[in-house]
């Protein structure tokens, strides 16, 4: 059996894996256990009541968190003409067409989000094998293929998170940083859960949001009692 590190022993002793914590208690525990030398992210795992094997029950989308994620996001936009100018004005770091595609093919990928206008997809389509595996391929379902690229850039900069269930029907994303106020983390979590409820597939039956767990980048998961969250989100 592998020897537990001091940090792992502390987490094991502090976190009751059988308990669902009130959101305020859960966040306080995460803050107490966040001892890394950097500001850790607060991540969420949401177990959904779906059959992930069925394509018509998969959940995918994006939402802007009210208090952002605490991350500085670099945005690349494929657009031309007025759309390109609008993207630059909205704060996009990289804007182009074939020239931007050439940079990416060379491995120059200093960005976190890729947005494209519909007419630019003829260029972006050539980059599927590069962008796809990294989760960067623009997609209309998450608002990254859009005629309004300026709005998409602003959303990305404002703290938009994209979500997609994995093969086990679990959504993994981030809701902020461990140094956020508890209320801000709570409101971000509630906002995400509201968005997920709106995205519930009609084919999904029974309880949709089955379990919510929070963790920090280097920490253990803490299950959250949904009763302590906004009723419209639970």
UniProtKB/Swiss-Prot annotation:
Domain of life: Bacteria
UniProt keyword tRNA-binding, yes or no: yes
Listed PROSITE patterns: RIBOSOMAL_L1 (PS01199)
SUPFAM superfamilies in UniProt: Ribosomal protein L1
Gene Ontology terms, MF aspect: rRNA binding; structural constituent of ribosome; tRNA binding
GO CC annotation terms, alphabetical: cytosolic large ribosomal subunit
Pfam families named in the record: Ribosomal_L1 (PF00687)
Keyword annotations of the record: Repressor, Ribonucleoprotein, Ribosomal protein, RNA-binding, rRNA-binding, Translation regulation, tRNA-binding
Segments passing through the bilayer: none
GO terms under biological process: regulation of translation; translation
Alphabetical list of PANTHER family matching this protein: 54S RIBOSOMAL PROTEIN L1, MITOCHONDRIAL, LARGE RIBOSOMAL SUBUNIT PROTEIN UL1M
Subunit structure: Part of the 50S ribosomal subunit.
Function (record text): Binds directly to 23S rRNA. The L1 stalk is quite mobile in the ribosome, and is involved in E site tRNA release.
Family membership: Belongs to the universal ribosomal protein uL1 family.
Name by which UniProt lists this protein: Large ribosomal subunit protein uL1
Organism: Erwinia tasmaniensis (strain DSM 17950 / CFBP 7177 / CIP 109463 / NCPPB 4357 / Et1/99)
Taxonomy of the source species: Bacteria, Pseudomonadati, Pseudomonadota, Gammaproteobacteria, Enterobacterales
